[in-house]
Amino acid sequence: MTCQLKVRSKIVTALGSGLLFLVAGCGSDEKSTDKHAACDFGAQTGCSDGQVCEKVEGGAEETGCFAPVTVEGRVVRADDPNQGIEGARVVGRDENGAVVSLRIAVSGADGAYSLRVPTPRKEDGTPAVPALLLRADASGFATFPSGLRVAIPVDVSQPEKSEAGYRVVNDTTTVALDELADASGLGSVSGKVLAEGAAGTLVVAGGASGVADKDGTYVIFNVPAGELEVRGYAAGLSLEPASALVKAGSEVDGVDLAVSDAALGAVNGSVSFVNASAKTTSVVLVVASTFNEALKRGEVPRGLRAFPVSGAYAFADVPAGDYVVLAAFENDELVRDPDESIGGTAIQRVSVSGSAMDVAGFKITGALAVVAPGKDAPELLDGVPRFEWADDSSEDGYEVTVLDTFGTEVWKNVDVPRVSGASSVTLDYAGPELSSGYYQFRAVSWREEKKGAASRTYISATEDLKGVFIVP
């Protein structure tokens, strides 16, 4: 999903939406000072102080010692980007949830963090910084990404060379978090995933989640008080669940997740395309307890994303648990067919417990293109929002809904009239005054089964991740 960010005043580009994954490099005449020294990439040993072991592309040696590459930035309040957030856990991941950074970083008093990113080098030392997206969690703040906030790729195209190595630091490395309206009844859970390959494991308790570090340690912030089950999710990893008695304002530590001998399962299904020019989409498995019914999104564990999908799809090595299956969720000019009167249009749910599970096929249709705001990325607005989207060809009208960043409905108009002779439809917002924050408009086209009938058949809709705008 391609995104171009629009930034003004205090709005931070790290708040944007959309997914584009790039691998870029920056030219350098740097030579590895220990070019022929033996070093162990996995153990990170064999290099002198100030250097790290990296893989070498196309060289005589498979590894070499080089100055490190770091991604640096700040975690700040969304309502006051000058104020940093201390104690936030920041991790770099790829599009499938695998950890790209060497370790999770914890922000300092001013919100500053630094992530060491293992980076392949050319033989002359030129770094090819891998694509990565940032996730940040902090006590009392909504996780980024979550709600309407979708991770954007860090701009790794121009790493800055310094005496200590290479630094990636720009607007995309600043992460702004939304403060929760009420955190009084929340606590936290911490522990360790006791398994090899634990890095990136999604750990969930009470609908809240955290990500395990390379050594398996994890912290889940903002967990509702009560006795809760704690579970870990990652493709290919089976873990025993644990329990935690969470008290508001305190942390339950030592909640470790051991490897289980329970069999992994599988999820199989298919998609079909109706009235769609695009014929390739993606399918993801969302942990059910994290699913937001209003926004139709949630947390996807490492490795449980299938792309590209043009017909049948299959997830292997799926850990036990309850999942929501989403298709055509990403920006691909497609949406799940909104006509609930026919088969293959409902969101699928599946419980996995060691066997193969088949889910009903999805019908996918072409999306209504968003013109403004939020065509490519969250858009900062001045004044009353005016919504514009592509006209459908056979509609009798539209329904438009405005949601806030947590999925709460702010305003709805269910009788937007059809247009004739125009390529797009416009509608001025006429709801209550919007406070500062993120919002999304969604449009759905409909037609009447019979003229004057009360029942409606829904035809198409705007995409799940588009139409997002920012009120300053």
Model-predicted segments: where are they?
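Sec-dependent signal peptide recognition
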Residues: S9-S17
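N-terminal secretory signal peptides that target proteins for export/translocation
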Residues: M1-R8
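C-terminal motif of bacterial Sec signal peptides marking the signal peptidase cleavage site
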Residues: L22-G25
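Long luminal/extracellular ectodomains of secretory-pathway precursor proteins
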Residues: G27-S460, L465, I470-P472
